[in-house]
């Protein structure tokens, strides 16, 4: 659908191509001399391959987003139902957001943004943070005190830069363990 939107926006055929696949697809793109640029989101290891492929072919520009944190994109025709909301929340907060595929950015079309945010905020505020062995907990602790401090630093930066805090915020460290609050912002700067 993203490529279709690009076409509808007037991007000529062949300029924007979305080709999901595995290593052989990426390598073919990275090494092909007629491919003028490549953008990749994924692991640091695979990102390194794209730099190698570019250097061995036509020195094409390579845009890399390595280590994950891919966006969760909600298009204007999306049905804002429980499945979508649950997927949006789980993709961001599963394992405390401590995995490379966590969708820490949610890009939502303005047509459905209010409905989406309303439903997400209501469900996020109900998440129980606590001992991961407690079946009533939805989100466990950060891996270490240092990681919690890093997460709190990012949250504070969002607040300081004027993003609208919708839920959560900097942890209060009143619980035993390194528990971050499930936090939502709107209007973050790049």
Annotate each predicted stretch with a short phrase.
Residues 1-26:
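PLP-dependent aminotransferase-like
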Residues 4, 8, 31, 52:
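Short, well-ordered alpha-helices that flank and scaffold nucleotide-derived cofactor binding pockets
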Residues 20-28, 42-49:
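Beta-loop-alpha module in the N-terminal Rossmann-like domain of NAD(P)-dependent dehydrogenases
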Residues 30-32, 174:
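A short, aliphatic-rich alpha-helical micro-motif
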Residues 32-38:
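Glycine-enriched alpha-helix->loop->beta-strand junction motifs that scaffold or abut catalytic
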Residues 37, 45-190:
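ALDH superfamily catalytic-core signature
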């Amino acid at each position: 659908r993203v490529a279709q939107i690009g076409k509808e926006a007037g991007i000529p055929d062949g300029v924007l191509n979305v080709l999901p696949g595995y290593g052989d697809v990426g390598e073919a793109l990275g090494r092909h001399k007629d491919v003028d640029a490549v953008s990749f989101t994924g692991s640091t290891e695979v990102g390194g391959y794209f730099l190698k492929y570019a250097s061995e072919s036509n020195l094409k520009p390579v845009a890399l987003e390595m280590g994950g944190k891919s966006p969760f994109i909600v298009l204007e025709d999306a049905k804002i139902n429980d499945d979508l909301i649950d997927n949006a929340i789980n993709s961001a907060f599963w394992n405390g957001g401590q995995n490379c595929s966590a969708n820490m950015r949610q890009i939502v079309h303005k047509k459905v943004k209010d409905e989406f945010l309303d439903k997400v905020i209501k469900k996020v505020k109900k998440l129980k943070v606590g001992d991961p062995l407690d079946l009533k907990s939805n989100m466990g602790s950060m891996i270490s005190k240092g990681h919690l401090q890093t997460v709190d630093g990012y949250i504070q930066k969002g607040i300081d830069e004027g993003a609208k805090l919708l839920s959560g915020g900097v942890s209060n460290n009143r619980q035993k363990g390194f528990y971050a609050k499930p936090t939502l912002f709107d209007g973050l700067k790049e």
